[in-house]
């Protein structure tokens, strides 16, 4: 029987890329899922298919502690996946206060509501590779300091540290995830490099690279991310992992230019990318070691970058036909 059968699970950020895939997988595995939704996003992957009819939706925002407390109590929640965030770096630079409110205040509201709620057994908080800021040594491992410098990075460093506080001070069973750049069909943030490139190529337009093209990142396929989150939550108790942070990555690094050229090749396109060289406040080289997850969780990703990109291109090709 699935670990998740009849578990009462609360998911924030369920209209986002990761949240929508995670919710669907939890429902498939028999969980009773309740999602916190601020804005109605009808094009979200969450609303594709029948899963939406099998979950509860609580309307509200992370900034409203009373809404979160009510949801945890009324739906007798035992597991929380806190995925919601203002996740766009450019938006964060333009609107730091609203980003801090969503990402920092929102996180402590979730954790505080969980602290007061007696049924909570496990909380997973989505941090980010950006929480590390810029480090001299690569790849980043979980023992490196959290030292974001710009609004989005700092918001993730803070949320990450606050999560540790709730474990060390109150014994809250919380784990933190730090992933590379997530991608996959259903990401509607078209200022992100993969969906933007695919959209432009489908329209016959040259893809644009905001940076100089040499920035190195690791790209992590969404279905691998879902399995990583579920595995961590499942093993938290038996492996005594509360208070731990885990990097998840397929540990394949690409420059932005290499990534775009890979997509062009897979789409049989002769278009040439336009390198704009406008990237500001971005870390030049950033990628993660997932050795801890491999050792302690016996985790391995299922998808190569090529397999993930092929599935992603297929999704957007169908999406833009509608």
Swiss-Prot record:
SUPFAM superfamilies: NAD(P)-binding Rossmann-fold domains. InterPro entries: NAD(P)-bd_dom, NAD(P)-bd_dom_sf. The keyword Ribosomal protein does not apply. The keyword Phosphoprotein does not apply. Pfam families: GDP_Man_Dehyd. NAD(+) binds at residues 8-36. Its cofactor is NAD(+). It comes from the Bacteria. Keywords: Carbohydrate metabolism, NAD. Gene3D superfamilies: NAD(P)-binding Rossmann-like Domain, UDP-galactose 4-epimerase, domain 1. Substrate binds at residue 128. The active site is at residue 152. Belongs to the NAD(P)-dependent epimerase/dehydratase family. PANTHER family: DTDP-D-GLUCOSE 4,6-DEHYDRATASE-RELATED. This is Putative sugar dehydratase/epimerase YfnG.
